[in-house]
């Protein structure tokens, strides 16, 4: 929190690093010096959970406040038809997504598993910067596993989009058991 405050007051430059780098640069050394590193608890996962809480639940901050870098930036594309989004659970679908996105000038995102609130924040920020009207209807075409995990990933992505102002969505699942 102190780093965020210093960045916002322009006393320090934005971090421009990954969350994991933030953990290794600031949090882990501090816990180590305090004798508070735990081998029983995944404290990095706790950090991520706490930051997500501060961003999404308590709405105290945004990832861009600190300047975290989006490690999934290369796996998303904003198309001219930005309100049509083809997304997949797996990074391995990135080439397919890119081909379709280029052919039809649509947006695409390969999530790489459970979607990151940070990734969605920056994706929607890119839309805002491009002048995309977030109040219009968005059509989301999902390529996720036809199982509970896939549906959780799909629903989490849609929920994150809604959190960032994209609330008029229609989801079309492209994976069905009869395929």
Features from the language model and the residues they span:
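Short glycine-rich or small-residue beta-strand-to-loop segments that form or flank ligand, phosphate
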Residues: 139-145
């Amino acid at each position: 929190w102190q780093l965020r405050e210093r960045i916002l007051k322009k006393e320090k430059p934005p971090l421009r690093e990954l969350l994991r780098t933030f953990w290794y640069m600031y949090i882990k050394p501090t816990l180590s010096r305090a004798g508070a590193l735990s081998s029983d608890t995944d404290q990095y996962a706790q950090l991520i959970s706490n930051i997500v809480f501060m961003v999404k639940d308590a709405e105290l901050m945004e990832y861009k406040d600190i300047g975290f870098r989006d490690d999934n930036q290369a796996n998303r594309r904003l198309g001219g038809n930005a309100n049509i989004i083809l997304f997949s659970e797996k990074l391995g679908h990135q080439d397919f997504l890119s081909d379709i996105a280029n052919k039809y000038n649509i947006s695409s995102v390969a999530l790489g598993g459970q979607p990151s609130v940070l990734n969605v924040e920056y994706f929607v920020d890119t839309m805002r910067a491009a002048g995309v009207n977030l109040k219009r209807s968005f059509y989301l075409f999902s390529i996720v596993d036809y199982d509970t995990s896939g549906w959780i990933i799909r629903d989490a992505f849609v929920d994150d989009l809604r959190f960032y102002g994209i609330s008029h969505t229609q989801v079309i699942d492209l994976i069905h058991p009869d395929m």
